[in-house]
Amino acid sequence: MAHKKGSGSTKNGRDSRSQRLGIKKYGGESVIIGNIIIRQRGSQFKPGVNVKLGKDDTLFALANGKVIFKKKKKKHTIVNVIENILQ
C-alpha cells in the first residue's frame, strides 16, 4: 500500500491567445498607406476621410498623413487621416 497518494494530472492550465484589439495609432500620429489605425470587433469607430473599414472591422489608412479622431453623438467616433501637404 502506498504511503503517499499519487498526484493526479489536471486538464486545466491553458489559455487562448488574446486578440490584440484596440487603437494602434493615436490622434496626431503619422501614418502611411495601409497602416492599421484601430483593430476592433463591431464598429464603435467609424471610417472617415482617407480611412477604410476592413472585413474584420479594422480601420486602416488610405493616404499618408496624421490621424484625427472626431466624436459623433455619444457612442461613435469618426477616424480621419489628414494628408500631409508639405513633404
From Swiss-Prot:
A molecular-function term among this protein's GO annotations: structural constituent of ribosome
Cellular component terms per the entry's GO annotation: chloroplast; ribonucleoprotein complex; ribosome
GO biological processes: translation
Keywords, ordered alphabetically: Chloroplast, Plastid, Ribonucleoprotein, Ribosomal protein
UniProt xrefs under InterPro entries: Ribosomal_bL27, Ribosomal_bL27_CS
Ranges where the record places region Disordered: 1-20
Subcellular location: Plastid, Chloroplast
Gene3D superfamilies registered for this protein in UniProt: 2.40.50.100
Family statement drawn from the similarity comment of this UniProt entry: Belongs to the bacterial ribosomal protein bL27 family.
Name used for this protein in its record: Large ribosomal subunit protein bL27c
